[in-house]
């Protein structure tokens, strides 16, 4: 038996209970971050912002938030502020610590699992903001509620201070500031303004009546900073107009729009036909872009085809149609069966 084979055999024999690792708290997120945020490149870096913003959007969908501010700070940290109810800070009996610390340090913790707190949620798995905490060298949570300002700081998922009352206030809301960990995001920790702007613009169209503001405090070469404000009064109708602006001429000026609910599930559809050669379909579930489609998109396509077919039959349109296919083939080989 070779030396290499002997080493392999020894390793197999040495495999025991001592080799089984139990990762506590948010260690699993830091150990395998891509399992939670997709990757640790540029896409994953920006996904951290989306996770925090999604919490604010969920507050808006529940009817408690109207304004969301996202700021890229000079040191490439991110601050997300909303005027929602504010994350609870009272004592959590089961976990033995404040509800704020539970939300920020325990996976699968949050109000999304309580039907009375959120009817619709884009972060049902409840790992979002705790993952952001785990993958940041610094996270500061500031909560405005019950007339007080609560604050707690963290590093790499672990609290570095207790929940403290640092002032008084007359408003409500949550402010999360975090700085991504360069040990995790080795490719880049620099945020791109346009990537965040595109996502916030999309969210504004998907959630009409909500203001999303983006600020970049990093001065450019001329010393200027940038900001954009996204707000949509008509929602999906405006989204279709925006998407169709560079895709040819509309065949029908009026946008086809449907907003209804069935079996407790709200459905909203906006569409417009134009003279371009390819379709442009975007489907979403709870504000999340389902780029691979799904039963919701398949069902929509079938329903649309069925509706158009029925209209054509009922109106007698099919009887008037004539179809002719003319094919000229100069090459004899094109006439073979293969």
Name each model feature, range by range.
Residues 46-54, 97-113, 197, 240-248, ...:
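A short, contiguous, amphipathic alpha-helix enriched in charged residues
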